[in-house]
């Protein structure tokens, strides 16, 4: 596996792949990789002749007071995991290499970005779309793989990809969970022992919502109230940032539940904010 840090070197290599007609799979990450990232890399490996992964803690997707400086970093560890997952090229640029000092251009999808995470992180997805656009232009991927844990990001990037004509196949990789149901996240290492003990309750609350839909409940409000009660009882150290029932494509609120609906949440602990979701698609007939 080759590690590249300069965009110009990656651009030159990607040009060679294009001329050779090679299919390229791409997995963008912020590093501190775990088994969830590994699953995305293996998905890409199964769909392309060449696999590129990026490790870049993108400063433009962090807002004031967020955890940019505290976000865990370990490139040596990341390189070992990426190599084991079948990655051919690991791109690990610096912020200075990715952004000109006078950079003033942004890419955003405001209709989808205002919901869910965007309500409390208004500039987050602008940063995500901008850096992914830049990475797409460098890598020229045939297929790009993103985790479904950040469902909103996946929806936004699909829209951006279609609107800007990148022509990349966007694939969503299933959420990978710990044995107790907690969604894998690089930020989980920053939970206190007590918070880590309670954190699986996030997924349990969403599973409760999914079960209520399966049992015939159609009132989203009643379901969300039940999930809030579950969180109050089982995740008392967490503060709900949002808890919503939305259309999986438009991200608009769903009420009543008469079609597949996404239950999505973000919960804040002392030093970390965790997101999770479940798709309730198995509606009673």
UniProtKB/Swiss-Prot annotation:
Under the heading InterPro entries, the entry gives: Pantoate_ligase (IPR003721), Pantoate_ligase_C (IPR042176), Rossmann-like_a/b/a_fold (IPR014729)
Annotated catalytic residues: 37 (proton donor)
- One GO cellular component, as annotated: cytosol
Q: Does the keyword Nucleotide-binding apply?
A: yes
Where do the annotations place beta-alanine binding? Answer: 61
Q: Where in the cell is it found?
A: Cytoplasm
Please describe what this protein does.
Answer: Catalyzes the condensation of pantoate with beta-alanine in an ATP-dependent reaction via a pantoyl-adenylate intermediate.
The name this protein carries in UniProt is: Pantothenate synthetase
């Amino acid at each position: 596996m080759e590690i590249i840090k300069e965009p110009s070197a990656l651009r030159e290599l990607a040009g060679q792949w294009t001329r050779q007609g090679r299919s390229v799979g791409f997995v963008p990450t912020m590093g501190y990789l775990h088994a969830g990232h590994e699953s995305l890399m293996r998905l890409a490996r199964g769909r392309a002749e060449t696999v590129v992964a990026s490790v870049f803690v993108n400063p433009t997707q962090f807002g004031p007071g967020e955890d940019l400086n505290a976000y865990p970093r370990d490139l040596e560890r990341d390189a070992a995991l990426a190599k084991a997952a079948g990655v051919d090229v690991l791109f690990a640029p610096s912020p200075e290499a990715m952004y000109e000092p006078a950079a003033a251009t942004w890419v955003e999808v405001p209709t989808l970005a205002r919901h869910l995470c965007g309500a409390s992180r208004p500039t987050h997805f602008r940063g995500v779309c901008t850096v992914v656009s830049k990475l797409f232009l460098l890598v020229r991927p045939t297929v790009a793989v993103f985790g479904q844990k950040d469902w909103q990001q996946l929806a936004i990037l699909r829209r951006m990809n279609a609107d800007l004509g990148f022509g990349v196949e966007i694939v969503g990789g299933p959420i990978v969970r710990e044995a107790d149901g907690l969604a894998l996240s690089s930020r989980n290492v920053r939970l206190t022992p007590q918070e880590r003990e309670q954190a699986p309750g996030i997924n349990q609350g969403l599973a409760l919502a999914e079960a209520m839909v399966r049992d015939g409940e159609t009132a989203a409000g009643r379901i969300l109230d039940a999930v809030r009660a579950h969180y109050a009882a089982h995740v008392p150290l967490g503060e709900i940032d949002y808890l919503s029932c939305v259309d999986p494509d438009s991200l608009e609120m769903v009420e009543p539940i008469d079609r597949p609906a996404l239950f999505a949440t973000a919960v804040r602990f002392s030093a970390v904010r965790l997101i999770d979701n479940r798709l309730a698609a198995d509606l009673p007939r």
